[in-house]
A protein has these predicted regions:
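Acidic/aromatic-lined carbohydrate-recognition and catalytic surfaces
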Residues: 2-13, 17-74, 90-360
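Hydrophobic faces of well-ordered beta-strands that scaffold small-molecule active sites
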Residues: 109-113, 146-150, 341-345, 417, ...
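The substrate-binding groove and active-site-proximal loops of carbohydrate-active enzymes
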Residues: 114-129, 215, 307-322, 383-401, ...
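Short, solvent-exposed turn/loop segments enriched in Gly/Ser/Thr/Pro and often Arg
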Residues: 149-160, 347-352, 420-425, 468-471, ...
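Acidic, His- and aromatic-enriched active-site or binding-groove loops in soluble protein domains
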Residues: 164-192, 357-381, 441-451, 486-498
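Conserved alpha/beta catalytic core and glycan-binding cleft of carbohydrate-active enzymes
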Residues: 249-252, 360, 462, 469-612, ...
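Active-site neighborhood of glycoside hydrolase catalytic domains
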Residues: 319-337, 399-486
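Substrate-binding/active-site clefts of carbohydrate-active enzymes
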Residues: 340-402, 406-409, 428-443
Length: 667
């Protein structure tokens, strides 16, 4: 019921006989409130440490304080000298936010798409926020879903030699500008020059070529959009810049910049430096190859660069501001359409050690280690994932500021958030640089603190939290997460008992999201056709003998799936054998699997668009980089096809009917 504060430098011969006046409590991190609490001397326990020159105050907690992040400041005067101290005080709820309908037993359905893979007649070869708004419309109108899951939108390099994995970004604080809808930006409408550039035959031909490419061409799309964004930024400055300080758009821009503070400053500085050195030192692909003077974000060389290149830095702040505006508009559309959740975001575990977050916040990482996984049956040598672990002590001493910032950013403009590898809140597997993965160790984190902070940001953002808890999970950890209101993440492929039998649909937990597969696993069509096993052989991951063993294991797994679907009443017994023998999912099998997922007691049922539309291609093939087209696969059906193609509309109608028959949806 009390907290303690120490005021340094207190004279050891001073008598304490006067009451302390006020304790000021300021809520930090984008909150602008200040509260003062007057305390009587009888409420304060005071003692003096003569040896250390400290005044120890024990003060009562205010009884009516709301959840939030506060900095408490205590100040007292002795003669002409003032003594003060402060401490961070974080007040957290017991559980994460739960939408009210969940408290009365509602269960809902959602569809998941990879935004980069959306095809449309309007986009520039990659899905954008205009497409996402149309996906939301289609999903609500045709599927009657309450949420749309999307891949992590984190900022990537969008260029070689870096990969395009949204799970190994340059920054988790900011987002990838390739998703911006250029034509929909306000400054595009105000820029005849930008409109003329887009209308040029060579630009239109380039856009059409990018649309028609089999895979997403991140680098060329980023180059094209960057050139247009620079023109739009010039238009913004001319029409609304510093000479128009009182214009509402400049005020909104400044409000965004100030609210993001040092985080956006360092991110934008990194991007500007990257552009600068790409011209000066084309072979310098990472910040570690820049001149040493630019390795520190707070060093004099960087400060000088910031002064001399203010507009280049403002440009990258402008880009993120525009992303924020467009993403907010998508979430608002989802809620207006009647969705309970709207966008379901995804927060990656990792950051690239060559990226903006690491450069800007080096003190918060351990560069001498990599995160990975210990040896197991899947990877006998263990796994080294290549990214650095966080410095848990420095992050804790900061008041968990970067941890909170990442949560806040990724909860923003959405109704649910998936935390990748949620075991990170408990531990990570650290591997010393240069050592084998088998030589790594598990390092514990401050789990209780981190879980409480997740609850806090979930409540403040009114965001449902899903914890990706696949893999090696500590004993009782799933139960602990559920007790905090964090939904578990359950996959149809993996939910099996000790005898390898598929679990009955009734045995799935209520506090969970259930799905068929993920971006790292074969789609239903790929699983049934052994496509993932074929790929492993083609890429030399397994030999012929191992391939045959995996195929036999898969045949047995498919038989167990058929048995469960028949037993639970989702697959007619007379079509079971044909479904098992078929090299592709039969219509009956597809219907049965979808119906099984929808009928589980789990609060959220999520179907990936690849599994709805029976696409054989998976988004990512673990253990590969250039050997497999990862994170570049475009959707089988275009945005226009979704409402007009007979096969697409038939499958959408099946989704809606099965979800409604299972009782999913709001009353």
């Amino acid at each position: 019921s009390h907290f303690s504060m120490y005021l340094e430098g207190w004279p050891d011969d001073t008598l304490i006989d006067a009451p302390l006046g006020n304790v000021i409590m300021r809520e930090s991190l984008n909150r602008i409130t200040e509260q003062k609490y007057s305390l009587d001397s009888g409420e304060i326990s005071i003692s003096v440490d003569d040896e250390k020159g400290l005044l120890h105050l024990s003060l009562p907690f205010p009884s009516d304080i709301e959840t939030g992040i506060y900095r408490l400041e205590a100040k007292t005067c002795l003669g002409e000298k003032t003594y003060h101290s402060d401490l961070l005080w974080i007040v957290c709820p017991e559980k994460c936010y739960q939408p009210p309908p969940f408290q009365t037993g509602s269960r809902i359905a959602g569809i998941s798409i990879a935004l980069y893979g959306v095809r449309s007649e309007r986009n520039w070869g990659v899905g954008d926020f205009f497409d996402l708004k149309n996906i939301v419309d289609w999903a609500r109108d045709e599927l009657k879903v309450d949420f749309v899951g999307i891949n992590p939108l984190h900022a990537l390099f969008n260029k070689r030699p870096f990969n395009n994995s949204p799970y190994l970004p340059s920054s988790r604080f900011y987002r990838n500008f390739i998703y911006l809808d250029i034509i929909g930006m306000e400054d595009f409408k105000e820029s005849p020059k930008a409109q003329a550039l887009v209308a040029l035959p060579e630009t239109q031909n380039r856009i059409q070529r990018l649309q028609n490419e089999e895979h997403v061409n991140y680098e060329e799309i980023a180059d094209l959009k960057t050139s247009l964004l620079q023109e739009l930024f010039r238009t913004f400055l001319e029409n609304h810049g510093k000479s128009h300080r009182h214009h509402h758009r400049w005020t909104e821009f400044e409000t965004y910049r100030v609210s993001e503070g040092i985080y956006i400053e360092r991110y934008a500085t990194f991007c500007a430096l990257q552009d600068h050195f790409q011209g000066e030192l084309p072979e310098a692909h990472t910040w570690r190859q820049w001149p040493v003077a630019f390795h520190s974000p707070s060093g004099p060389a960087v400060k000088k660069f910031q002064i001399e290149n203010e507009e280049r830095i403002l440009f990258w702040i402008y880009v993120q501001w525009q992303i924020d505006i467009q993403l907010q508009s998508v979430q608002e559309r989802a809620i207006q359409k009647g969705m309970l959740i709207g966008l379901y975001h995804d927060e990656a575990l990792a950051v690239d050690r060559n990226g903006a977050d690491f450069w800007g916040w080096q003190d918060y990482f351990h560069d001498g280690f990599s995160v990975g996984a210990p040896p197991d049956a899947f990877a006998p040598e263990g796994q080294d994932w290549g990214f650095p672990p966080p410095d848990r002590e420095r992050i804790r001493r900061s008041g968990y500021e970067p941890f909170l910032k990442i949560l806040q950013v990724n909860c923003r403009h959405g109704g649910a958030l998936r935390i990748d590898h949620v075991m990170q809140l408990n531990h990570l597997f650290w591997i010393p640089m240069g050592k084998k993965a088998s030589e790594g160790v598990f390092v514990k984190d401050y789990e209780s603190d981190l879980l409480s902070l997740v609850c806090l940001e979930s409540e403040r953002g009114r965001t449902l939290i899903v914890g990706e808890d696949l893999g090696t999970v500590p004993f009782n950890y799933r139960e602990r997460l559920m007790s905090k209101g964090i939904l578990s993440y359950r996959l149809f492929y993996f939910e099996r008992d000790q005898h390898e039998n598929q679990l009955p649909f009734r045995d799935y937990p209520q506090s969970a999201l259930v799905s068929i597969s993920t971006h790292d696993l074969p789609t239903l069509a790929g699983f049934w056709s052994y496509r993932d096993i074929d790929l492993r052989r083609e890429m030399g991951q397994v030999d012929t003998q191992q391939e045959k063993a995996l195929q036999e294991e898969r045949r047995l797994h498919k038989a167990k799936i058929i048995e469960r679907l028949v037993t639970d009443g989702f697959l007619p017994a007379q079509t079971a054998h044909a479904a098992w023998e078929s090299p592709v999912p039969t219509d009956d099998l597809h219907t049965a699997v979808l119906s099984f997922i929808f009928h589980t007691p789990s609060k959220l049922a999520l179907i990936n668009q690849e599994d709805l539309f029976l696409d054989i291609r998976q988004q990512n093939f673990p253990g590969t980089t250039s050997e497999h087209p990862n994170w570049v696969t475009k959707m089988r059906f275009s945005l226009e096809d979704l409402r007009s193609n007979p096969e697409a509309t038939r499958l959408a109608e099946k989704f809606r009917r099965l979800a409604e028959d299972s009782g999913r949806g709001l009353p």
